[in-house]
Amino acid sequence: MASSLLTTPSQTLAPNPAAARARRSSPAAAQVSFSSPLLPGRRALRCARPVAIEKEVPEKEAPTTFLREDGSGAGSGSVRERFEGMIRRVQGEICAALEEADGSGKRFVEDVWSRPGGVCVHSRVLQDGNVFEKAGVNVSAVIGVCPRSAYRAAKGAAKNGAADGHKAGPVPFFSAGISSVLHPKNPFAPTLHFNYRYFETDAPKDVPGAPRSWWFGGGTDLTPSYLIEEDVKHFHSVQKQTCDKFDPSFYPRFKKWCDDYFYIKHRNERRGLGGIFFDDLNDYDQDMLLNFATECAGSVIPAYIPIIERRKDTPFNEEQKAWQQVRRGRYVEFNLVYDRGTTFGLKTGGRIESILVSLPLTARWEYDHKPEEGSEEWKLLDACINPKEWL
């Protein structure tokens, strides 16, 4: 999961020499401040200058908005403002639904931190509940600059800048997202992962008028330890219904993308039983894709909570629990070896608690473990090796 905004190479924060000089001469210039907003009652994350990744700073509470007070930020009605509002709302709705399903009376622990260069993350985590061993729901936003070569969509700006022989410099960007992994205790209740994010650039300051770039990414996928077709079909039907509201080609396209992405090469199997996944999506109207991402995020509760309610109290034995731990081991392997967000965060000094919040509390590795052919465990493994059409 890796808190989706410090996660992909296209989002690397580049050093800014001017900002570095400003910090040396005026330390306060690099600070994040929650200052008097333009809109009454709103506190905005204000970033004096985009800077390189720096040490995180704990915050007492989450700001009302992560956005700057400028023409495309707080109060502008921009896509970035609407997307940020959506992920903040969805975080609250999902945490409330999970607390109700857990029934332990426990509440999500909240953790808010920022970086002076324009990063703010609001993590919410529930551990050792009645139903959930570990559940994390994070929202985050980054305001910074990308190196000119760091992302493919900025190539248009380089062409514009080449007309006068001037090479475009670093590109200002904004990114925001919600990311979550939910690990239940019961082996018959599946793990769920979802992640929805938005990325956009501004024109480089040395190439005014260059085209802005933007894209959406994300997905929702299910990772059971036991194959219960009723549950898997319900989950996939919700994904298809959501996709079909926008384009009938979305579900088959994004289902295959999901099966391909969550592939554990060294095991020759998928992490789970799929769902939908997409990235760098910008080939449709921007408002349409914003609505699509909003619908996808909103479909998490109806796709998952009914399954949890059916399975959270299913009796199980020690062998079934051990199999769940083996499958959790596969989850850990994928996240630490292949997941782009996790590996990028580990390599670039990201906040470790946010990066590893996706991992389960417990997992298991048995030497040369092979389930008996025809067993319930084997059926799950076969479906992970050979992706199926569930609808």
Curated annotation (Swiss-Prot):
Residues 125-134, 331-366 are annotated as: Important for dimerization. Keywords: Chlorophyll biosynthesis, Chloroplast, Heme biosynthesis, Oxidoreductase, Plastid, Porphyrin biosynthesis, Transit peptide. The keyword Plastid applies. SUPFAM superfamilies: Coproporphyrinogen III oxidase. Substrate binds at residues 179, 195-197, 349-354. GO terms for biological process: chlorophyll biosynthetic process; protoporphyrinogen IX biosynthetic process. The active site is at 193 (proton donor). The keyword Amino-acid biosynthesis does not apply. The record marks 266 as: Important for dimerization. Residues 1-34 are annotated as: Disordered. It is found in: Plastid, Chloroplast. One of its GO terms (molecular function) is coproporphyrinogen oxidase activity. Residues 14-30 have a biased composition (Low complexity). It catalyses: coproporphyrinogen III + O2 + 2 H(+) = protoporphyrinogen IX + 2 CO2 + 2 H2O. Its EC number is 1.3.3.3. Pathway: Porphyrin-containing compound metabolism; protoporphyrin-IX biosynthesis; protoporphyrinogen-IX from coproporphyrinogen-III (O2 route): step 1/1. Involved in the heme and chlorophyll biosynthesis. Catalyzes the aerobic oxidative decarboxylation of propionate groups of rings A and B of coproporphyrinogen-III to yield the vinyl groups in protoporphyrinogen-IX. This is Oxygen-dependent coproporphyrinogen-III oxidase, chloroplastic. The lineage of its organism: Eukaryota, Viridiplantae, Streptophyta, Embryophyta, Tracheophyta.
